[in-house]
Amino acid sequence: ILVVTVYLLPGNRSWGVLVLILGCITMVLGAVMAVFSTNLKYILACTSLSQIGFILVGVAMLTLLGEHNALAAHGTVLYMLNHSLVKLTLFLFAGVVYYNTHQLDLNRIRGFGRGKPLLHGLFLCGACSLAGIPGFLGYVSKTLVHEAVVELAVETGSTAITVVEWLFLLSGGLTVAYLTKIYVAVFWQTAPADAHAASRRWGTPLSVAALMLAAIPLPMLGLLPHGLSEKIAAATLSFTGGHDFSHAVHYLAWENLKGVVISLSIGMLVYFLLIRPLLTERRDGEIRYRSLWPAWLSLEESVYKPLFRWLIRVLMTLCRVACDLLDLLVLV
């Protein structure tokens, strides 16, 4: 999509609007699905869906802002970098959990992270960066993309773009909510009564090193936005068709911090007003998570599997037609 936007349809506003609409739908839908899920791997998969939506919003801003796309160009590239490192961290974390417990349901992996400070810290690196907490790469990238949306809203005076901004902040809040759900379940709740005893040694030296290599750059890049992160993004401007900054970005200015404060507030409201009272239940003295997401709303069952079956039928028909044509050619 980035290549199509930059090289095949440069400056095409209709394409930019289409990408923006797809981005908004994707980032909100993925976040909502993650809030309702109780399976760790499925939550992380929905997280990827949502974060791709954020990236698509940044790609759309590249086109819609035209020559004033410096914020979008830097933010989109850094968002892709952040997404790669965060997902590497969190999926490795999920692998560690599954390797030790052979479970992925939050009700079965509760308390696994208790007494594991290194795993605790590495998870927080990934989660805080994904949530856009200041001091992490995710804050830098999310701030740049958010400010690009704000710039377009001011430039055009469009109510629709203001709605996009609030969808951006809402999705960020939902991100905070489902990450808090995972964090509390794995690191603070007590383990199920029938869970097997977990060893404090949760990974091999190689797996621990892999997790550290993925997680540690997140705060490093977040604490050095001008000296490191922006230089990485600037090296890609010739590819993204972006422009360099005309002035320094003040990441800790209130105007930039305000966005993350709003998202954090939304996230805490969703966690304490939706997840805790409605998506958990107390049974036998234990807090258990439950999923209220309707089965018929499953993307896998209602979209992907039917589409896959349809594609197979189409390909089978094409192959049959090709075979018949070859038979005719042989007969002729």
What is the predicted function of each stretch?
Residues 30, 127-131, 168, 172, ...:
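Hydrophobic core segments of alpha-helical transmembrane domains in multi-pass membrane transport
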Residues 78-79, 91, 107, 144-147, ...:
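Feature representing long, continuous alpha-helical segments
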Residues 129-144, 215-236:
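Alpha-helical transmembrane segments and their membrane-interface junctions
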Residues 23, 126, 207-221, 242:
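Hydrophobic membrane-spanning alpha-helices of multi-pass integral membrane proteins
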Residues 228-261, 274-332:
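Aromatic-capped, Gly/Pro-kinked transmembrane alpha-helices
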Residues 1-202:
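Hydrophobic transmembrane alpha-helices and their helix-loop junctions in integral membrane proteins
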Residues 160-172, 248-269:
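Hydrophobic alpha-helical transmembrane segments
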Residues 173-188, 262-283:
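Transmembrane alpha-helical segments in integral membrane proteins
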